[in-house]
From Swiss-Prot:
Part of the 50S ribosomal subunit. Contacts protein L20. Pfam families: Ribosomal_L21p (PF00829). One of its GO terms (cellular component) is ribonucleoprotein complex. The gene is rplU. One of its GO terms (biological process) is translation. GO terms for molecular function: rRNA binding; structural constituent of ribosome. The lineage of its organism: Bacteria, Pseudomonadati, Pseudomonadota, Gammaproteobacteria, Enterobacterales. This protein binds to 23S rRNA in the presence of protein L20. This is Large ribosomal subunit protein bL21. Belongs to the bacterial ribosomal protein bL21 family. Signal peptide: none annotated. Keywords: Ribonucleoprotein, Ribosomal protein, RNA-binding, rRNA-binding. The keyword Transcription does not apply.
Length: 103
C-alpha cells in the first residue's frame, strides 16, 4: 500500500514505515502529525484518486528530526570588473516517519 500526498508545495509518494524529508514543520520532535491533503491511495489493484483530494484519506506520521540541508552557494561575478559576491543558503527540513495510511 502506498499513497501520494502534498506538503510544503511538493508531492511525496510514501508507504508505511518509510521516512520522508519534508519542508520544515513547526511541530516538536516525537509528536504525531496528520496529513489530510492525500492525492492518491493505492492498495494492490485498488486505486483511489482524489479530485483534488481523496475523501477521508489521512496519512499519520511521527516527527523524527529537524535539521538543515547541505549548503548551496550563490555566486555573482562580473568579469574584468573586480566584482565578486558570494552567499550561502541552508534550507530547514523535517524528517517524518509514516505510521499509517487510511482512506
Amino acid at each position: 500500500m502506498y499513497a501520494v500526498f502534498q506538503s510544503g508545495g511538493k508531492q511525496h509518494r510514501v508507504s508505511e514505515g518509510q521516512t520522508v524529508r519534508l519542508e520544515k514543520l513547526d511541530i516538536a520532535t516525537g509528536e504525531a502529525v496528520e496529513f489530510a491533503e492525500v492525492l492518491m491511495i493505492a492498495n494492490g489493484e485498488e486505486v483511489k484518486i482524489g479530485v483534488p483530494f481523496v475523501d477521508g484519506g489521512v496519512i499519520k506520521a511521527e516527527v523524527v528530526a529537524h535539521g538543515r540541508g547541505e549548503k548551496v552557494k550563490i555566486v555573482k561575478f562580473r568579469r574584468r570588473k573586480h566584482y565578486r559576491k558570494q552567499q550561502g543558503h541552508r534550507q530547514w527540513f523535517t524528517d517524518v516517519k509514516i505510521t499509517g495510511i487510511s482512506a
